[in-house]
């Protein structure tokens, strides 16, 4: 199974800079977990990989301000075209990131989080 980063890395761009290429099929890394890394919160969102680019699939859900994991789970379950394996893969990675942030990540920089989870897209101020 190709990961999201591998799919995006294989994308080609036309003369106008528009990504084109392979849209992954079910269980081929069709989704990209995005994390907003902040000092007092971590937010999670999912993008779908389409035609070599990405398209937002969910809004950002904040932890611990709200139960981001449960909200993300509900959002993914509401999309019947997402396979169980894909949903589990995204939620497992979200669990890893939340646990890391809770246990040791609050004191870690954004760059340290990126190194810990290279397959996840990060942005933020921490």
Swiss-Prot record:
InterPro entries: PSRP-3/Ycf65_sf, Ribosomal_PSRP3/Ycf65. Probably a ribosomal protein or a ribosome-associated protein. Gene3D superfamilies: 3.30.390.140. It comes from the Bacteria. Part of the 30S ribosomal subunit. The lineage of its organism: Bacteria, Bacillati, Cyanobacteriota, Cyanophyceae, Synechococcales. GO terms for molecular function: structural constituent of ribosome. GO terms for cellular component: ribonucleoprotein complex; ribosome. GO terms for biological process: translation. Keywords: Ribonucleoprotein, Ribosomal protein. It comes from Prochlorococcus marinus (strain SARG / CCMP1375 / SS120). It holds the Pfam family PSRP-3_Ycf65. This is Probable small ribosomal subunit protein cS23. Belongs to the chloroplast-specific ribosomal protein cS23 family.
